[in-house]
A protein has these predicted regions:
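Polyanion-binding surfaces on beta-sheet-dominated domains and ring/shell assemblies
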Residues: 1-289
Length: 289
């Protein structure tokens, strides 16, 4: 399959360095009345929601004694109809024959186990990232619970879920060192593709998931140990909080190029997130009096 045409266009009409339409909103309709902060984020057809509970006092008294800062726990999930495989499974469930039905049941169980294992891995990643990004020293002997779910998965679901979590933290008033943004990129047909969709993810190319800060790093802040640095262009420098390479092996130059592409895309997506934050703050300020 040709992922990039001769004209330099992808299957959905985008250029290699273009991301899909993104939309950021606060207060998702599912948990806005029961949580301290909630948000939803959409990247193309990929849609994710997130909720934040806390910070609150730790439930375990024995754990309070040894806990110096905020403990962050994450829970990630995905709906049964989020992926295209689930839709195909529903369509095949109407076929006749006990053999086909047993095969469909086995396939459904296997897919469920894979999704559950993948969600647990994503939750562990988010816990490590948020522990670094949040100022945990302000909340000693406390805990914070983050819940996120992917409603529709059309590629780059992990980046969409993380951006929803960042917005939910802002809605809950949890202090972070900066506004963070995540983006995915892959390499297919010798081209570096930003914000890969579901079709490009199934191309089994090298994929990079990157979380970076949105502000430029100042010279006097270089001693602040939070992550690595990447020059986006000649005038800006971003701090990389976390990145992960999956899907195979490639050269260091390729990985560096994919990370730079992710940081450049995160810079554009963060502008949409900041617009949503400003609207949220103005709304809260108007309802205060």
């Amino acid at each position: 399959m040709e992922f990039v045409s001769i004209e330099g266009l992808r299957q959905d009409g985008r250029r290699a360095s273009e991301h899909r339409f993104c939309l950021a909103k606060f207060e998702n309709a599912i948990a806005r009345t029961t949580c301290d902060g909630s948000a939803q984020f959409q990247l193309g057809q990929t849609f994710a929601i997130a909720s934040v509970f806390g910070p609150s006092q730790s439930q375990s008294k024995a754990q309070e004694v040894y806990q110096e800062g905020l403990k962050v726990t994450c829970e990630c999930s995905s709906t049964s109809f989020a992926s295209e495989l689930a839709i195909a499974r529903v369509g095949n469930s109407s076929t006749n024959g006990s053999t086909d039905k047993e095969a469909n049941i086995t396939k459904a169980r296997t897919q469920s186990l894979r999704s559950e294992r993948r969600n647990k891995e994503i939750a562990k990643k988010f816990e490590r990232i948020l522990t670094t990004a949040i100022d945990i020293r302000r909340f000693p002997r406390s805990e914070l619970h983050v819940s996120c779910a992917c409603v529709n998965d059309d590629g780059s679901a992990i980046a969409c879920m993380f951006n929803a979590v960042v917005l939910a933290l802002v809605d809950a008033g949890v202090p972070t060192f900066d506004t963070y943004c995540a983006m995915c990129a892959t390499r297919l047909d010798g081209e570096k593709l930003l914000d890969c969709n579901d079709l490009e993810e199934r191309g089994r190319g090298v994929e990079v998931f990157c979380v970076s800060e949105t502000r430029n790093v100042l010279e006097e802040e270089n001693d602040y140990d939070l992550g690595n640095f990447r020059n986006v262009d000649d005038t800006s420098e971003k701090r990389i909080v976390y990145y992960e390479v999956t899907g195979g092996k490639c050269s260091a130059e390729t990985i560096d190029g994919l990370i730079r592409l992710c940081v450049k895309g995160s810079e554009d997506v963060s502008k949409v997130m900041r617009v949503a934050m400003n609207k949220r703050f103005r709304r809260l300020q108007s309802t205060r009096y």
